[in-house]
Amino acid sequence: MLERLKKSLLEAPVFKRGEYDYFIHPITDGVPEIRPDLIREVTANIVRIANLDVDKIVTVEAMGIPIGIVLSILCDIPLVIIRKRKYGLPNEVEISQVTGYSRSQLYLNGINRGDRVIVVDDVISTGGTLQATLDSMELAGAEVMDTVIVVERGNGAELLRSKGYNLKTMVRVKVEGGRVSEVEPGISK
């Protein structure tokens, strides 16, 4: 299961961004190309493991978008994209995002009090983006029914699980020696 994803991660190039070893992969970066068979495998697995009894799918710009769009089409559930640009719409929620290599603001629109949502994204490392996303759902009054992340690395997922969040991941990667050295099954319960 997830053989295409695992193989492609093991083949992913890695470069340094400051002190951070950053792997480049179609699901997490859209580079060199997002192949239909890979995105199909990933989204089919989300359908298999996720609670999709929800009103909306929520994802974060940029690389959560391909996953969210395909999942939205497969499941006929509307998609809300947390954006990097302020729109100034009523009830817009501003989110402070801190990742392993940057700080920025994100903006949530389209979530109403009482909405039942699933959060999907491409990767979790430090957990900063996901923590900000989950906090914004609470501020907006939404109920997060499930959270599914494709690639787990670092300790961010464990940190959020220790805070009581239900977080599913498909694979866990280890990056060392300038390459993705291990790809193990994630936690999908």
Curated annotation (Swiss-Prot):
PROSITE patterns: PUR_PYR_PR_TRANSFER. Pfam families: Pribosyltran. One of its GO terms (molecular function) is guanine phosphoribosyltransferase activity. It is an enzyme of class 2 (transferase). GO terms for biological process: IMP salvage; purine ribonucleoside salvage. It catalyses: IMP + diphosphate = hypoxanthine + 5-phospho-alpha-D-ribose 1-diphosphate; GMP + diphosphate = guanine + 5-phospho-alpha-D-ribose 1-diphosphate. Pathway: Purine metabolism; IMP biosynthesis via salvage pathway; IMP from hypoxanthine: step 1/1. It comes from the Archaea. Gene3D superfamilies: 3.40.50.2020. NCBIfam families: HPT_Archaea, PRK02304.1-4. This is Hypoxanthine/guanine phosphoribosyltransferase. It comes from Methanothrix soehngenii (strain ATCC 5969 / DSM 3671 / JCM 10134 / NBRC 103675 / OCM 69 / GP-6).
